[in-house]
């Protein structure tokens, strides 16, 4: 048992030959479900020296990411159970939570990173209000610094579960006040979310983002925040809006508009739950970069979705 359970049982059940490699540098981590294999089911064991585990440092948050994190933290409550995605922006949320007045937070996440350790050291993580796995921080895999690896080592309060458990909406729905915080690349005026490609260029996989949005939607008191800076600079040095009239050709829809909850940029956050198509457009334009708002309004008119929300 190392830094994650992930899909081990599913892979082992499908394998014709099972070879285990012993890595003396991996921390021994407690597991919560199907984390063991009987020696009779193993065909070969390989031992030998290994390089030290990679230590990954998250880059510091930008000013825009810090403002996004402030909005997210302001809209959280004591006793929330957290899932943070990958990158500097969710990490900024975690670091801000560590300095906040919030109490009795819990962890139920796919990826465990250093910001959770920051929150734990600040006394924010107790897991005492969780409805399942109480007093335990649940994760799928851990990646970060040596300090993080030391924290999870033989720690009965930090346990790894397979993705089929920790990511499953059927699991998350049983956690009251579950809060999901993730990045994306772009959002269109309908609320469709792209978090894995720029056009046809693949940047990442779907990961657990959609799972956790579905889970947060059915968690009592649950919330989901999709965060993005309002613009990026392209190869020609031009500023480009991440909030677009329509997703660009080839953009992959990671999350359908029906699951969009809070969309947050450095200009604020908007709640899209229950909004009509034109209300979504109006709210999303309000958190776009000011330079692009008039242009987005004109596109919304052309698409037939620019109607003020007080006109139904």
Q: Model features per residue range: what roles?
A:
Residues 8-16, 100-118, 195-226, 290-295:
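Gly/Ser/Thr-rich active-site loops/lids in small-molecule metabolic enzymes
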Residues 8-22, 37-48, 108-110, 114, ...:
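Structural signature of FAD isoalloxazine-binding scaffolds in flavoprotein oxidoreductases
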Residues 25-66:
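Small/polar-residue-rich loop-to-helix segments that shape phosphate-bearing ligand pockets
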Residues 56, 60-149:
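N-terminal active-site beta-alpha-beta segment that forms phosphate/nucleotide-binding
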Residues 109, 122, 126-202, 208:
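A glycine- and small/hydrophobic-rich beta-loop-beta segment
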Residues 259-312:
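Extended hydrophobic packing segments that form well-structured cores
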């Amino acid at each position: 048992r190392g830094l994650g359970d992930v899909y081990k049982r599913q892979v082992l059940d499908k394998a014709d030959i099972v070879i285990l490699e012993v890595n003396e540098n991996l921390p021994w981590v407690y597991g919560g479900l199907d984390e063991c294999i009987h020696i009779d089911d193993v065909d070969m064991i390989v031992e030998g020296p290994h390089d030290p585990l990679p230590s990954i440092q998250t880059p510091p948050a930008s000013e825009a990411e810090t403002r996004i994190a402030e909005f997210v933290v302001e809209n959280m409550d004591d006793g929330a159970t957290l899932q943070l995605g990958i990158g500097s922006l969710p990490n900024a949320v975690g670091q801000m939570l560590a300095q906040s007045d919030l109490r009795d937070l819990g962890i139920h996440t796919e990826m465990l990173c250093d910001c959770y350790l920051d929150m734990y050291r600040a006394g924010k993580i107790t897991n005492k209000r969780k409805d399942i796995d109480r007093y335990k921080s649940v994760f799928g895999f851990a990646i970060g610094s040596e300090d993080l690896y030391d924290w999870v080592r033989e720690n009965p309060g930090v346990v790894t579960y397979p993705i089929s458990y920790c990511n499953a909406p059927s699991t998350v729905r049983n956690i009251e006040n579950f809060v999901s915080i993730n990045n994306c690349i772009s959002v269109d005026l309908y609320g469709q979310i792209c978090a894995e490609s720029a056009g046809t260029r693949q940047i990442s996989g779907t990961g657990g983002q959609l799972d956790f949005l579905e889970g947060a939607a059915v968690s009592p008191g649950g919330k989901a925040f999709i965060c993005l800076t309002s613009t990026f600079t392209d190869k020609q040095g031009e500023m480009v809006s991440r909030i677009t009239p329509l997703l660009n050709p080839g953009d992959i829809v990671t999350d359908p508009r029906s699951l969009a909850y809070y969309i947050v940029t450095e200009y604020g956050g908007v709640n899209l739950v229950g909004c009509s198509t034109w209300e979504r457009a109006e709210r999303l334009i309000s958190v776009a970069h000011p330079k692009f708002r008039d242009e987005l309004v004109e596109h919304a008119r052309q698409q037939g979705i620019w109607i003020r929300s007080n006109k139904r």
